[in-house]
Swiss-Prot record:
This is Probable 4-deoxy-4-formamido-L-arabinose-phosphoundecaprenol deformylase ArnD. The keyword Hydrolase applies. Pathway: Glycolipid biosynthesis; 4-amino-4-deoxy-alpha-L-arabinose undecaprenyl phosphate biosynthesis; 4-amino-4-deoxy-alpha-L-arabinose undecaprenyl phosphate from UDP-4-deoxy-4-formamido-beta-L-arabinose and undecaprenyl phosphate: step 2/2; Bacterial outer membrane biogenesis; lipopolysaccharide biosynthesis. GO terms for molecular function: hydrolase activity, acting on carbon-nitrogen (but not peptide) bonds, in linear amides. Its EC number is 3.5.1.n3. It catalyses: 4-deoxy-4-formamido-alpha-L-arabinopyranosyl di-trans,octa-cis-undecaprenyl phosphate + H2O = 4-amino-4-deoxy-alpha-L-arabinopyranosyl di-trans,octa-cis-undecaprenyl phosphate + formate. PANTHER family: 4-DEOXY-4-FORMAMIDO-L-ARABINOSE-PHOSPHOUNDECAPRENOL DEFORMYLASE ARND-RELATED (PTHR10587:SF137), GLYCOSYL TRANSFERASE-RELATED (PTHR10587).
Length: 300
């Protein structure tokens, strides 16, 4: 069986409320463990609408048919009213996710705020954002938070240095090909990074592939991934509007000898055996703006 890390990003209030229970049910049906990364503070995702003035973001929203994919309540959340507090209302669901045998980690305190402002936040502001998220998630699951995944893959050396203060066992903050140990600005080695290696639904549908062909597309991408494959889905997509498609993907994967697993399962016992690399800002296909991307030391 080919192991593929399954990362589930939970970005919004409705995605937590509706998408997570749906995903828990389908994962139990197929006997799969995954890694859930929760946004836990205010749902302000509607504030992304100003980005429609940026051509790449507008094109992404149009080709993915965002209104149908996500729903207007998600697209407008936190615009004309304060964003709902996610962990405050769904802490028990986050704990139930952990009790169901899945990894549970921090995605963000304020997902929209992180994506929009992380590049300009001071070290103190970055630390406060991570601390707020950890406090809320830890209160919800009643256990230490041991892993994290930066919202929108918006992470660079500054972010990694701040996260090092919180002693995560691993982070999944970037796009890349295989797990590695990141070099930090002070020359030390940070907590292991497990990059996402495969495209997400919204990155390729409407440009590279039609919705009805997506499962075959991603199965083929997994088959040709020669690194350590990691696939990201979203509670707001595969747990809601594309739930049936995701269920069918899990059936196809099993038939082709693909076993999805939690990200922590991909790591070797000896973490020192992993190569050292860097996380750098770079443009990424299907995404607007910069993302954190894995880079070899000699390329950075």
């Amino acid at each position: 069986m080919k192991q593929v890390g399954l990362r589930i990003d939970v970005d919004t209030y409705r995605g937590t409320k509706e998408g997570v229970p749906s995903l828990l049910a389908v994962l139990e049906k197929h006997d799969i463990s995954a890694s859930f990364f929760f946004s836990v503070g205010p749902d302000n995702m509607g504030r992304h609408l100003w980005r429609l003035f940026r051509p790449r973001f507008l094109w992404k929203m149009l080709r993915s048919n965002a209104a149908s994919l996500y729903g207007w309540d998600i697209l407008l959340a936190g615009t004309a009213w304060p964003g709902k507090q996610i962990a405050k209302d769904f802490g028990p669901l986050m704990k139930a996710t952990l009790q169901a045998g899945h990894e549970v980690g921090l995605h963000a305190w304020d997902h929209q705020g992180w994506q929009a402002k992380v590049a300009t936040w001071s070290e103190q502001q970055l630390t406060e954002q991570v601390q707020l998220g950890i406090d809320a998630l830890q209160h919800s699951i009643q256990q230490p938070v041991t892993c994290s995944a930066a919202a929108g893959w918006r992470a660079d050396e500054r972010v990694l240095a701040v996260k090092q203060l919180f002693s995560f066992s691993y982070n999944s903050d970037c796009r890349g090909t295989h797990p590695f140990r990141p070099l930090l600005p002070d020359g030390s080695i940070g907590s292991v990074q497990i990059p996402v290696t495969l495209p997400t639904y919204d990155e390729v549908v409407g440009s590279e592939v039609r919705t009805e062909d997506f499962n075959n597309f991603i199965i083929n991408a997994i088959s040709h991934d020669n690194g350590v494959p990691v696939y990201t889905i979203h509670a707001e997509v595969e747990g809601m509007s594309q739930a049936l498609m995701f269920d069918q993907l899990l059936v196809m994967a099993k038939e082709r000898g693909i076993q999805f697993c939690a990200l922590g399962s991909l790591l070797p016992k000896n973490l020192d055996s992993l190569p050292v690399g860097k996380v750098v800002r770079a443009a990424f296909p299907g995404r607007e703006g910069w993302l954190g991307c894995q880079s070899a030391l000699e390329d950075a």
